[in-house]
Structures are given as C-alpha cells and as structure tokens.
C-alpha cells in the first residue's frame, strides 16, 4: 500500500475528476490508483491527469511508440507500478511485450525499430542518462525524422511521465493492483 492512502472512488465528488479517473482506467495508464492518490488535491489531480492523458493519447507521435518510451522511463525510474501498467489502446493497436522488451533493451541494434523510432527512444534515454548530450547537434539530428512540434510533444511527454513515475516510486507502491 502506498504511503499516501488513495481516496476511495465513492469519495471523489468532482464530476470532471471522476471522468478523468474513468478515462485512466479505460486506457490502463495510469489505472485508478495514482489518480485516486492525486485526488487528495482535486485541482492538481485534474491538471496532471489531463496533461498525462493528452500527452499520451493525442498528438502526432505514434501512441505505441509513446507507450514503449513510457515503460522504458518507468523502468529507468525504478517504478514497478508504472512499469507494470499497459495501455489498452497501444495493446489493441498491436503493441506486444516483445516490442516493449526491445525498446527497453538494446533498441539501437534492433531491426524492429525505424531510425525515427530509435531517435525517439534515444531522446528519452539521453534526457535522463546524459542530458548534456541533448544539444544543438542532437536536435538537428532529430529534425531529420520529426517536426519541431513532434519534438516538443516527445520532450513534454518524456519529462511529465518520468516525473510522475519518480513521484509514484517515492510513494512506496509496488506492482499495479
């Protein structure tokens, strides 16, 4: 059980927050646990959940790729909760555990990923392992595969989800319930 007790679903009175929690449950990422912990501060919960859902399910970068990145980051953050969750949408669209494993391992040598996908995975790696290497030359290389808008979409997604994963890890929860 996490160090901060989640609010019971029946105690969530704000209709927008209830709908966001239901959307999270349908997607599977996050399930209802993390949103119900955040629900102790409803305004913050709504803002964070809207941002998490928007960054993960919308935009012009493939959702399956974002899901691989999200899991890669959760593993890097040492968070078994987020690392164990799977997007129902990504799985329905054909993402499988073999692709996730390849994206979290030696994706650079994997024939499974295009050069563009490798750049996105590399971006996530470098933002947390070697941020100094994400420089003008790195962005110039990314621009061969992604528009500036897509780069911003990926960067914001990476920063937000990694931060939430580190936060959840500090709350002391293990694998998903």
Language model regions located:
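Conserved alpha-helical segments that form or flank metal/cofactor-binding pockets of metalloenzymes
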Residues: 66, 70-100
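Alpha-helical transition-metal enzyme core signature, strongest for iron centers
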Residues: 41-45, 72-83, 120, 124-131, ...
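Acidic/histidine-rich alpha-helical segments that form the ligand environment
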Residues: 112-156
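Acidic/His metal-coordination segments adjacent to aromatic residues that form catalytic metal sites
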Residues: 103-113
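Alpha-helical scaffold segments that form or flank carboxylate-/histidine-based iron centers
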Residues: 33-37, 63-78, 108, 152-155
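Mobile cap/lid helix-loop segments that border enzyme active or cofactor-binding sites
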Residues: 1-63, 87, 91
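Helix N-cap / loop-to-helix initiation motif
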Residues: 61-62, 96-97, 147-148
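C-terminal end-helix/capping segment
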Residues: 94-96, 169-177
């Amino acid at each position: 059980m996490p160090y901060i007790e989640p609010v019971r679903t029946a105690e969530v009175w704000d209709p927008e927050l209830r709908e966001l929690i239901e959307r999270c449950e349908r997607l599977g990422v996050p399930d209802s646990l993390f949103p119900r912990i955040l629900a102790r501060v409803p305004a913050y919960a709504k803002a964070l959940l809207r941002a998490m859902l928007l960054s993960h399910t919308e935009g012009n970068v493939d959702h399956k790729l974002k899901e691989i990145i999200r899991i890669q980051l959760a593993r890097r953050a040492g968070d078994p909760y987020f690392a164990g969750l799977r997007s129902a949408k990504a799985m329905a669209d054909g993402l499988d555990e073999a692709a996730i494993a390849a994206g979290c391992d030696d994706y650079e040598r994997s024939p499974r990923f295009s050069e563009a996908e490798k750049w996105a995975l590399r971006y996530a790696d470098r933002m947390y392992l070697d941020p100094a290497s994400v420089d003008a030359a790195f962005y110039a290389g990314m621009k061969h595969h992604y528009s500036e808008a897509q780069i911003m979409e990926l960067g914001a997604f990476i920063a937000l989800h990694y931060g939430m994963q580190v936060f959840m890890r500090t709350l002391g929860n293990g694998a998903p319930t």
